[in-house]
Amino acid sequence: MKVYYLNRERFSKGDTKIAFEFAKKLILENPNLNILTFLVYQQRQYESFLSEMGFTKQHYKYHGFVAKNGVRIQIHTIKTYNPDYQFVGSPQHEVLIAVGVPPKELEKYEDKSDIYACIVIPWLLDENLSFLNLHEAINIETNELITTNYNIDQRVVNAINWLKATS
Protein backbone atom coordinates (compact mmCIF):
# COMPACT_ATOMS: atom_id res chain seq x y z
CA MET A 1 0.00 0.00 0.00
CA LYS A 2 1.32 3.41 -0.98
CA VAL A 3 0.84 6.10 1.65
CA TYR A 4 0.28 9.76 0.86
CA TYR A 5 -0.48 12.59 3.24
CA LEU A 6 -1.57 16.19 3.38
CA ASN A 7 1.06 18.21 5.22
CA ARG A 8 -0.99 20.30 7.62
CA GLU A 9 -0.38 20.88 11.32
CA ARG A 10 -4.16 20.64 11.87
CA PHE A 11 -7.15 19.56 9.84
CA SER A 12 -8.94 22.43 8.14
CA LYS A 13 -11.94 22.83 5.91
CA GLY A 14 -11.02 22.13 2.31
CA ASP A 15 -8.43 19.43 3.07
CA THR A 16 -10.81 16.67 1.96
CA LYS A 17 -11.33 18.37 -1.40
CA ILE A 18 -7.57 18.53 -1.99
CA ALA A 19 -7.25 14.81 -1.16
CA PHE A 20 -10.28 14.00 -3.32
CA GLU A 21 -8.72 15.73 -6.35
CA PHE A 22 -5.45 13.83 -5.78
CA ALA A 23 -7.34 10.53 -5.49
CA LYS A 24 -9.20 11.24 -8.73
CA LYS A 25 -5.84 11.80 -10.43
CA LEU A 26 -4.56 8.43 -9.11
CA ILE A 27 -7.69 6.69 -10.38
CA LEU A 28 -7.39 8.27 -13.84
CA GLU A 29 -3.75 7.14 -14.05
CA ASN A 30 -4.54 3.55 -13.05
CA PRO A 31 -7.53 1.86 -14.74
CA ASN A 32 -7.47 -1.00 -12.19
CA LEU A 33 -8.60 1.35 -9.42
CA ASN A 34 -12.39 1.26 -9.11
CA ILE A 35 -13.21 2.26 -5.52
CA LEU A 36 -12.59 5.47 -3.61
CA THR A 37 -13.37 5.26 0.11
CA PHE A 38 -13.58 8.14 2.57
CA LEU A 39 -12.89 6.80 6.05
CA VAL A 40 -13.78 8.92 9.09
CA TYR A 41 -13.37 8.07 12.74
CA GLN A 42 -16.89 8.75 14.04
CA GLN A 43 -20.35 9.04 12.55
CA ARG A 44 -20.86 12.63 13.69
CA GLN A 45 -17.95 13.62 11.48
CA TYR A 46 -20.14 12.68 8.52
CA GLU A 47 -22.38 15.75 8.60
CA SER A 48 -19.68 18.37 8.09
CA PHE A 49 -17.80 16.10 5.71
CA LEU A 50 -20.86 15.39 3.57
CA SER A 51 -21.85 19.01 3.25
CA GLU A 52 -18.28 20.04 2.43
CA MET A 53 -18.03 17.47 -0.35
CA GLY A 54 -21.57 18.05 -1.67
CA PHE A 55 -22.89 14.61 -0.73
CA THR A 56 -26.50 14.12 0.36
CA LYS A 57 -28.10 12.18 3.24
CA GLN A 58 -28.87 9.38 0.75
CA HIS A 59 -25.14 8.91 0.14
CA TYR A 60 -24.63 8.63 3.89
CA LYS A 61 -27.50 6.15 4.26
CA TYR A 62 -26.11 3.80 1.60
CA HIS A 63 -22.42 4.43 2.43
CA GLY A 64 -21.74 5.83 -1.02
CA PHE A 65 -22.66 5.83 -4.69
CA VAL A 66 -21.30 5.03 -8.15
CA ALA A 67 -19.80 7.98 -10.01
CA LYS A 68 -20.23 8.65 -13.71
CA ASN A 69 -16.90 7.05 -14.61
CA GLY A 70 -17.86 3.78 -12.88
CA VAL A 71 -15.78 4.39 -9.77
CA ARG A 72 -17.62 3.50 -6.58
CA ILE A 73 -17.29 6.24 -3.96
CA GLN A 74 -17.84 4.98 -0.41
CA ILE A 75 -18.20 6.79 2.90
CA HIS A 76 -17.49 4.78 6.08
CA THR A 77 -16.55 5.04 9.73
CA ILE A 78 -13.91 2.73 11.16
CA LYS A 79 -16.75 0.52 12.45
CA THR A 80 -18.55 0.10 9.12
CA TYR A 81 -15.49 -0.17 6.85
CA ASN A 82 -14.52 -3.62 5.62
CA PRO A 83 -11.78 -3.63 2.95
CA ASP A 84 -12.18 -7.38 2.44
CA TYR A 85 -15.68 -6.94 1.01
CA GLN A 86 -15.61 -7.70 -2.72
CA PHE A 87 -17.91 -6.22 -5.33
CA VAL A 88 -19.07 -8.37 -8.23
CA GLY A 89 -16.82 -7.97 -11.25
CA SER A 90 -13.15 -7.17 -11.47
CA PRO A 91 -10.85 -7.48 -8.45
CA GLN A 92 -11.25 -4.58 -6.08
CA HIS A 93 -8.50 -1.98 -6.07
CA GLU A 94 -9.14 0.88 -3.76
CA VAL A 95 -7.90 4.35 -2.84
CA LEU A 96 -8.58 5.11 0.82
CA ILE A 97 -8.83 8.69 2.11
CA ALA A 98 -8.50 8.55 5.90
CA VAL A 99 -9.85 11.75 7.48
CA GLY A 100 -8.80 12.16 11.11
CA VAL A 101 -8.23 8.43 11.62
CA PRO A 102 -5.65 7.63 14.34
CA PRO A 103 -2.53 5.65 13.37
CA LYS A 104 -3.54 2.60 15.43
CA GLU A 105 -6.67 2.29 13.27
CA LEU A 106 -4.75 2.82 10.03
CA GLU A 107 -2.36 0.01 10.99
CA LYS A 108 -5.26 -2.45 10.73
CA TYR A 109 -5.46 -1.81 6.99
CA GLU A 110 -1.80 -1.62 6.01
CA ASP A 111 -1.63 -5.29 4.93
CA LYS A 112 -4.88 -5.35 2.96
CA SER A 113 -4.01 -6.20 -0.63
CA ASP A 114 -7.13 -4.53 -2.02
CA ILE A 115 -5.99 -1.08 -0.90
CA TYR A 116 -3.71 0.45 -3.52
CA ALA A 117 -3.12 3.74 -1.73
CA CYS A 118 -4.03 5.49 1.50
CA ILE A 119 -4.22 9.28 1.68
CA VAL A 120 -3.93 10.41 5.29
CA ILE A 121 -5.54 13.69 6.35
CA PRO A 122 -4.65 13.94 10.05
CA TRP A 123 -6.50 15.98 12.66
CA LEU A 124 -3.05 16.74 14.10
CA LEU A 125 0.06 16.00 12.06
CA ASP A 126 2.20 15.19 15.12
CA GLU A 127 -0.17 12.36 16.03
CA ASN A 128 0.45 10.61 12.69
CA LEU A 129 4.15 11.29 12.13
CA SER A 130 5.35 7.86 13.23
CA PHE A 131 2.90 6.10 10.87
CA LEU A 132 3.80 8.43 7.99
CA ASN A 133 7.55 8.05 8.56
CA LEU A 134 7.30 4.29 8.81
CA HIS A 135 5.49 4.09 5.47
CA GLU A 136 7.65 6.70 3.73
CA ALA A 137 4.60 8.78 2.94
CA ILE A 138 4.54 11.18 0.02
CA ASN A 139 3.19 14.71 0.37
CA ILE A 140 0.32 15.07 -2.14
CA GLU A 141 1.04 18.75 -2.75
CA THR A 142 4.82 18.61 -3.28
CA ASN A 143 5.23 14.94 -4.28
CA GLU A 144 8.16 14.71 -1.82
CA LEU A 145 8.85 11.96 0.69
CA ILE A 146 8.22 12.88 4.31
CA THR A 147 11.39 13.99 6.04
CA THR A 148 12.17 12.06 9.16
CA ASN A 149 13.45 13.90 12.18
CA TYR A 150 14.88 10.91 14.00
CA ASN A 151 17.51 8.28 13.26
CA ILE A 152 16.74 4.60 13.10
CA ASP A 153 19.27 2.26 14.68
CA GLN A 154 21.41 0.64 11.94
CA ARG A 155 20.57 -2.85 13.28
CA VAL A 156 16.88 -2.12 12.71
CA VAL A 157 17.59 -0.86 9.19
CA ASN A 158 19.59 -4.03 8.44
CA ALA A 159 16.78 -6.20 9.79
CA ILE A 160 14.19 -4.39 7.66
CA ASN A 161 16.37 -4.73 4.55
CA TRP A 162 16.85 -8.44 5.26
CA LEU A 163 13.09 -8.92 5.64
CA LYS A 164 12.44 -7.09 2.36
CA ALA A 165 15.05 -9.20 0.57
CA THR A 166 13.72 -12.51 1.88
CA SER A 167 10.00 -11.80 1.53
Give the location of each predicted region.
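Short, flexible loop motifs at catalytic/binding sites
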Residues: 1-167
